[in-house]
């Protein structure tokens, strides 16, 4: 099926029109519930006919969508409708009749002979076709949004002044060459200029026209539309750039060949000459009220009634066919179609003449204003189930459309009820949008310590790299709102310094981890809507303000909003290949860890019967925060992946979307970094489609055209095509289906080249068996249950589908729209912090000073201005340091004693009457403040003079003139006194330094006095004095020191250890120490783990010290109640059977026998359970031991499994005999396994 991405053609294809007429006739009397079946059956029957009249369902869908836009084209270029929404479907073009061809050629010659047409079309060879939607580079900006997702009409596609509006600067920006970027050219003779002029004027006279002179160099033929994606840079903020940013429009002209500049300039001059009278008439700036055009005025909302609409049944059938195409997923993006229908619902009739274009006879009714509104209302009524799946914010915006009342009252009430229910419902899994206190990545000892680096140099270098990274981030946060901020020039050198420190692979790995973790922290910023904050704002005015403020040139958030722009620019200016490679790996690892993790999984079928759960695994979802993190990771992973292949032209503009065969052949030889098809297929089989699909779509949307044609991407897209073609609302979870349809539809918008592949996939009838099987398994997991948890999906929907924000903007009611281009709101920026603070302080002080003092202040300022920079810096430094030191001195000598005295007086209050206590407290603290202020006035100036004198003595040379020294001291004293007085006022007098809520404090004092009185009346039996534990005969710290001394000597110098009696005495102290109650948990943990290590060292270093008494005493310590109750992590016995300990015992069978004796005693005494012991043995089976060691381990396990069966100690802990028997049985199995491992 030959196709081309165009909105519509001048002449619609005739076979499809005949089938539309036949279809309308056949479906007229079919019941509503059989429409879909008859509709599909009709095309199956037609598809078996002859080739001339053959029409597949896909061809018909392509034709119908294009014809629908063509029929309503008259409403695109005036203010009565929203921005035109062109179809993204490929138009199946058949050869028109001969008469039509002649007519088309005449019209083409007429258009091409007009200079105006050539100027407005910007070298576009198809002046009668509507511009194709442009391709953006990000998820937040829907492709083609310049032609769709905008709440104002786009009149730039109408073609010059003939489109119904006046001359503007935009008519010349595309064609007029930019002289600042031109190279010096050789002088062109007048003859050549004349030849070039004739060649440019006669370029469209026909295919047989030949140029009069040969160009100096060969120029490849190229047609560039001003709506193609070549004029938006890679990773730019939005797809609105071409329509809203004059600078980018002007840059797009640079890709024209320089040999055409003279011709373009001549055309511009001709255009000005032709429009001389019109320009003169538009010269006055002040336009009178009579001269205003209807489009410049704001009209009130007109009332409309759908009664008496002509051909109502015919229009209803058309809306039914349109609805069936949407239900069968024969439209690339269902949200795009909904936006188009809402626009049709809001159109108004200004009585303008209809656009002269071919309209199929079956759709002629849509050229009428009221018929168009009726058609849209019926379509929305048919798509009620789809509207109910929108999130609460989108539903609220949709219900703001006044013409939605044209729908049946029951439908509108159901939408309002559903919206209210969603707003009232709350779920514990909602995304936490509160501002987090964590702004930076915390230091983790296990990941960032010195042990994780090969040398001290790399460790020190990474600490410097970390500091430089955060300095760059802080600098960006302060300066990026400045209009003149330039990331490469201001932060590029700082980022270069990061890589200069070290590019060791370990450092790059840690830097990549830091980058990704900080990205996830910074991206989770508070983004509450006014509704969530409880603000009652005008939604229309708020939407307009958001359109102008959120980004520089877009009405919605850009591709990298807020702090994500810093990380994007950081990657863009990165000159380290090592960092980019490690960053790509880290992004993928984090993404896969979140995608495959089972920790955050939530199953939607928790309340379904057990037998139903066993039949299916899903569907599973993740928490909202996890989904948001995966989308961010996928976006940046795609950005880093495609960045080497997003080449730019010589002028800095991105290359047009051209599929280079050489590039495709070259990149086919290299295997991709990871298999997308395998990841998607595994998720579909495991019921994790709703987890993987959103981030996978985000990743695919970031890829370039060549990457999308690689084998792995093609296989992944075929799987998505199969899912999109087969997924339906019926018998499936509606919210899950909506998320899947919206994500895949958005991908087709983000990558318009994929639309042809989708329709070609639907048209084929063989070779998709494996895909169908996978899709059937996935859809089975999405089957609908009565008890499914819809609220979870409601919270996940706006995060998994962030493009709903653009959809909301597109359907927001707009009664006033002028040009379709948004103006900038220049952010009011502060000056440098020092200047702003000094100016504000000067203004405050100047307003309070007398004229004489103001004059004195001016003299001081003039004096400081006359001094050099070092002197001014000296005065500022001494002022700051003396101010802080005097504050500390005053706190120690004045404020703290004053507060202690006031607290002592409060403790002396004995009354229990609340009013009396409150009055006493007020008097006490009031006197304390007055006394503190009095002492502050008396002593602070002395403290200040003393500090100033000491500071100047240390900083100034001894030969400094006394007058100059006193001048410096006076300047410092004046500034410091002002700061001290401000600190006293804000931090003491107007703060809670002395007390908090005085009423609450009075209540506490009354309650305390009342309790004391009650206790005294009871005879003093309720004393709460601290009771110390009895003396145990030794110092605990001395005991711990002795234990550490034994461990140290046994490890290094066993010959220096004490005697066996000293060891027995140590264990007796341990038995007494663990019986002390209410000691810190770490104290018991040190004793228990220390004894474990002590017995290990005795086995390997001093086996003659180990006897039954030592083992029994150790078991009694481990069985103490304090150690049994402690839940320290790691546990006491975690290192009992370690790999290093077994390696040390490998050459000694006696060591294994002594270990067996210890473990048997521990099992019999109940110090350890058999199941816990099994867990300690399990890591040993991951090692490759020698047959001798395996034999000794097997014998050890066999003896332990037999020794503990008759023990009754495990009953004391509450364990059942069955569990203990199973543990011993498992130990026997481990013994057999260890004995037979050497045979494998």
From Swiss-Prot:
Superkingdom assignment: Eukaryota
Keywords attached to this entry: Cytoplasm, Phosphoprotein
Keyword Phosphoprotein listed: yes
Biased composition (Low complexity): 113-127
Gene Ontology annotations for the cellular component aspect, listed alphabetically: cytoplasm; nucleus
Effect on the protein upon substituting residue 418 to Y: In strain: 2b
Expression across tissues: Ubiquitously expressed. In larvae, it is expressed in all imaginal disks, salivary glands and weakly expressed in the gut.
Effect annotated for changing residue 734 to T: In strain: Oregon-R
GO biological process: chromatin organization; imaginal disc morphogenesis; morphogenesis of a polarized epithelium; olfactory behavior; regulation of cell population proliferation
The keyword Cytoplasm appears for this protein: yes
Principal place of residence: cytoplasm
Pfam families named in the record: Codanin-1_C
Signal peptide feature range: none
Disordered: region residues: 105-162, 179-218
Ranges of Polar residues composition bias in the record: 128-155
Subcellular location(s) of the protein: Cytoplasm
Phosphoserine modified-residue sites: 156, 166, 1234
Record note on what altering residue 425 to L does: In strain: 2b and Oregon-R
Residues annotated as transmembrane: none
Mutagenesis or variant effect for residue 358 to C: In strain: Oregon-R
Miscellaneous comment text of the record: Its transcript shares the first untranslated exon with the alpha-Spec transcript, suggesting a common regulation. It was initially identified as a candidate for quantitative trait locus (QTL) that affects olfaction. However, given that the mutant used to identify this gene also affects the alpha-Spec gene, this result is unclear.
Entry function: Regulator of cell proliferation and cell survival of differentiated cells independent of cell division. Essential for imaginal disks formation. Not involved in cell polarity.
Protein name per the record: Protein disks lost
Organism: Drosophila melanogaster (Fruit fly)
């Amino acid at each position: 099926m030959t196709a081309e991405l165009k909105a519509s053609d001048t002449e619609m294809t005739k076979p499809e029109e005949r089938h539309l007429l036949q279809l309308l006739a056949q479906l007229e009397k079919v019941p509503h519930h059989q429409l879909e079946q008859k509709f599909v059956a009709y095309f199956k029957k037609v598809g078996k006919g002859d080739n001339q009249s053959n029409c597949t369902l896909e061809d018909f869908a392509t034709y119908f969508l294009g014809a629908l836009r063509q029929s309503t084209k008259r409403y695109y270029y005036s203010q009565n409708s929203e921005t035109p929404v062109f179809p993204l479907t490929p138009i199946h073009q058949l050869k028109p009749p001969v008469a039509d061809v002649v007519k088309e050629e005449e019209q083409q010659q007429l258009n091409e002979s007009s200079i105006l047409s050539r100027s407005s079309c910007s070298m576009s060879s198809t002046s009668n076709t509507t511009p194709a939607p442009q391709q953006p580079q990000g998820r937040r900006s829907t492709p083609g949004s310049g032609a769709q997702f905008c709440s104002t009409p786009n009149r730039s596609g109408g073609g010059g002044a003939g489109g119904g509006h006046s001359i503007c600067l935009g008519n010349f920006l595309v064609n007029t060459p930019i002289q600042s970027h031109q190279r010096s050219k050789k002088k062109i003779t007048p003859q050549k200029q004349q030849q070039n002029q004739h060649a440019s004027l006669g370029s469209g006279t026909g295919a047989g026209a030949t140029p009069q002179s040969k160009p100096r160099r060969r120029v490849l033929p190229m047609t560039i539309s001003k709506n193609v994606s070549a004029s938006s840079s890679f990773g730019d903020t939005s797809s609105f750039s071409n329509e809203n940013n004059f600078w980018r429009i002007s840059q797009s002209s640079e890709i024209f060949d320089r040999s055409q500049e003279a011709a373009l300039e001549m055309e511009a001059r001709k255009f000005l000459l032709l429009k001389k009278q019109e320009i003169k008439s538009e010269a006055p700036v002040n336009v009178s009220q009579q001269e205003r055009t209807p489009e410049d005025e704001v009209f009130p909302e007109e009332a409309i009634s759908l009664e008496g609409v002509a051909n109502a049944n015919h229009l209803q059938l058309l809306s039914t066919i349109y609805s069936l195409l949407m239900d069968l997923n024969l439209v690339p993006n269902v949200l795009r179609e909904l936006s188009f229908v809402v626009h049709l619902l809001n159109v108004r009739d200004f009585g303008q003449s209809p656009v002269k274009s071919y309209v199929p006879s079956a759709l002629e009714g849509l050229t009428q204003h009221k018929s168009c509104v009726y058609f849209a209302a019926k379509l929305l009524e048919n798509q009620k189930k789809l509207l109910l799946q929108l999130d609460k914010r989108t539903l609220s915006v949709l219900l703001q459309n006044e013409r939605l009342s044209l729908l049946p009252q029951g439908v509108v009430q159901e939408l309002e009820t559903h919206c209210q229910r969603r707003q009232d419902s709350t779920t514990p899994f909602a995304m936490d949008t509160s501002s987090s206190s964590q702004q930076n990545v915390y230091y983790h000892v296990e990941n960032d310590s010195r042990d994780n680096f090969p040398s001290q140099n790399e460790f020190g270098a990474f600490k410097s790299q970390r500091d430089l990274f955060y300095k760059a981030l802080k600098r960006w946060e302060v300066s990026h709102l400045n209009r003149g901020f330039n990331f490469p020039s201001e932060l590029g050198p700082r980022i270069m310094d990061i890589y200069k420190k070290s590019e060791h692979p370990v450092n790059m790995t840690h830097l990549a981890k830091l980058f990704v973790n900080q990205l996830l922290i910074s991206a989770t910023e508070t983004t509450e809507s006014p509704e969530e904050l409880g603000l009652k704002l005008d939604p229309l005015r708020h939407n307009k303000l958001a359109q102008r403020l959120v980004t520089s040139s877009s009405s919605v958030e850009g591709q990298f909003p807020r702090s994500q722009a810093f990380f994007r620019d950081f990657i863009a200016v990165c000159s380290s290949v090592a960092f980019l490679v490690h960053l790509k790996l880290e992004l993928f690892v984090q993404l896969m860890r979140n995608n495959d993790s089972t920790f955050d999984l939530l199953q939607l079928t928790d309340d379904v019967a057990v037998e139903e759960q066993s039949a299916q695994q899903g569907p599973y979802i993740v928490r909202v925060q996890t989904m948001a993190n995966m989308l961010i990771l996928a976006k940046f992973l795609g950005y880093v992946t495609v960045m080497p292949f997003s080449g730019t032209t010589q002028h800095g503009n991105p290359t047009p979307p051209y599929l280079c065969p050489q590039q495709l052949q070259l990149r086919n030889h290299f295997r991709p970094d990871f298999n997308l098809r395998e990841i998607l297929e595994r998720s579909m089989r495991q019921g994790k489609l709703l987890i993987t699909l959103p981030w996978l779509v985000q990743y695919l949307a970031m890829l370039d055209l060549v990457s999308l044609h690689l084998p792995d991407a093609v296989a992944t897209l075929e799987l998505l095509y199969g899912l999109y073609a087969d997924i339906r609302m019926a018998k499936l979870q509606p919210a899950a289906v909506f998320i899947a349809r919206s994500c895949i539809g958005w991908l087709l918008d983000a990558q318009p080249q994929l639309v042809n592949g989708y329709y070609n996939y639907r048209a084929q009838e063989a070779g998709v068996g494996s895909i169908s099987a996978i899709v059937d398994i996935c859809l089975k997991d999405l089957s609908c249950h009565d008890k499914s948890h819809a609220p979870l999906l409601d919270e996940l929907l706006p995060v998994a589908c962030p493009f709903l924000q653009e959809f909301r903007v597109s359907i927001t009611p707009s009664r006033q729209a002028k040009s379709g281009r948004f103006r900038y709101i220049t952010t009011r920026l502060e000056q440098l912090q020092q200047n702003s603070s000094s100016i504000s302080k000067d203004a405050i002080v100047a307003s309070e000073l007398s004229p004489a003092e103001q004059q004195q202040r001016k003299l001081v300022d003039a004096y400081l201005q006359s001094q050099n920079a070092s002197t001014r810096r000296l005065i500022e430094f001494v002022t700051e340091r003396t101010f802080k030191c005097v504050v500390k001195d005053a706190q120690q000598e004045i404020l703290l004693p004053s507060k202690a005295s006031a607290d002592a007086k409060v403790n002396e209050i004995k009354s229990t009457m609340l009013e009396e206590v409150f009055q006493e407290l007020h008097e006490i603290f009031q006197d304390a403040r007055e006394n503190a202020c009095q002492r502050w006035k008396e002593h602070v100036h002395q403290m200040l003079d003393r500090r100033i004198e000491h500071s100047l003595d240390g900083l100034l040379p001894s030969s400094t003139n006394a007058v100059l020294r006193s001048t410096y001291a006076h300047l410092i004293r004046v500034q410091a006194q002002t700061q001290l007085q401000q600190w006293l006022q804000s931090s003491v007098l107007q703060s809670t330094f002395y007390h908090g809520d005085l009423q609450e404090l009075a209540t506490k004092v009354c309650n305390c006095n009342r309790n004391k009185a009650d206790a005294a009346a009871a005879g003093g039996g309720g004393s709460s004095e601290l009771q110390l534990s009895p003396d145990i005969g030794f110092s605990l710290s001395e005991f711990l020191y002795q234990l550490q001394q034994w461990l140290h000597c046994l490890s290094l110098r066993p010959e220096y250890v004490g005697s066996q009696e000293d060891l027995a005495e140590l264990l007796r102290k341990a038995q007494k120490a663990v019986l002390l109650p209410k000691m810190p948990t770490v104290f018991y943990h040190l004793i228990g783990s220390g004894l474990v290590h002590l017995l290990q060292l005795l086995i390997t270093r001093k086996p003659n010290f180990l006897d039954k008494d030592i083992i029994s005493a150790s078991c009694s310590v481990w069985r103490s109640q304090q150690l049994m109750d402690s839940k320290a992590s790691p546990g006491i016995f975690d290192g009992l059977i370690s790999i290093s300990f077994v390696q040390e015992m490998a050459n000694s069978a006696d060591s294994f026998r002594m270990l067996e004796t210890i473990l048997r005693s521990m099992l019999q005494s109940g110090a350890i359970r058999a199941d816990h012991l099994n867990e300690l043995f399990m890591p040993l089976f991951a090692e490759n031991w020698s047959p001798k060691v395996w034999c000794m381990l097997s014998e050890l396990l066999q003896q332990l499994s037999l020794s503990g069966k008759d023990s009754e100690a495990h009953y004391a802990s509450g364990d059942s005999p069955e569990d203990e028997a199973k543990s011993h049985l498992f130990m026997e199995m481990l013994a057999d396994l260890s004995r037979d491992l050497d045979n494998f």
